[in-house]
Swiss-Prot record:
PANTHER family linked: DNAJ HOMOLOG SUBFAMILY C MEMBER 9
Region (Disordered) residue spans: 266-299
Cellular component annotations (GO), alphabetically ordered: cytoplasm; nucleus
InterPro entries: DnaJ_domain, DnaJ_domain_CS, HTH_DNAJC9, J_dom_sf, J_domain-containing_protein
Organism: Drosophila melanogaster
Bias (Basic residues) ranges: 268-277
Designated name of the protein: J domain-containing protein CG6693
Domain of life, per lineage: Eukaryota
Record's keyword terms, sorted: Phosphoprotein
Amino acid sequence: MSTLELCEKYFGTRDVYKLMELARGAGEKEVKKAYHKLSLLVHPDRVPEEQKAESTEKFKVLSKLYQVLTDTQKRALYDEQGVIDDDDESESKLSSWLELWSKIFKPITEEDINNYEKEYVESELERTDLKKAYLGGKGCINYLMNHVPFMKVEDEPRIQKIVQDMIASGEVPEYKIFTEEPAAKRKKRHQKYAREFKEAKVIKERLKRRQKEKDDQDLADNGGDLQQMILARRNQRESNFGSLMDRLMEKYGNEDDSDTVDFSAFEKKKKKSKKPAAKQETKPKLNGVKAGRVEKGKN
């Protein structure tokens, strides 16, 4: 299938700008932020196993569109004729797109995420996102949980008050699924998040124990100051922490356009490095962001 056919299949439209939520005159910075925001929702390393197959295809489509919209000639071809060049077979490889993604977006630390959460919660930006998610999900609270950053079940009374005020003022329509949510649905959601929280806590403790065992073993094998070794290892882990969302990129990342990847140079490098008997491709590992209650997966 062509890229535009895949756009229609997975996103319901052939309009690249509509899909990316961009104006036709959007610049590279806006394209980059839009790609980051959408790709985080379908990144293969950040979705449950049962969603990986479809999410991988969506991720590849979004990456292709990012490439088109940041390439002057390819974008002009699409703008003028509604055509996307699908000749490069190497673009179908997930590893190529994952490598590009890791080059485009700089790492963000857990401290950055925590600081941003403090600024975001109860801000005007949160209200804007809440309104958009309420309309997008037609009042479904499960949808809100998955689309409003940092929202958790403890926030439901506060969120309901904000939306009720919007309804009362006529800013948004009333959806019965929100104002009269069935108790069974609410109970199921709360049980789901309570279960996921416990599972995440167990996994976190397990990882901490394994890391401590490794640090102790390193000390026994190599000697040295344990505190300095742990600090160095922690800094290394933080430097590899995955990006959370486009607004975090905007706040803590480099705003300069110079960090935009040169796709043409990247493609030439890929083609030049190809050999008849190539070694098995090693997929670059991307650390998913898992900062306690920040992670959201399924409805």
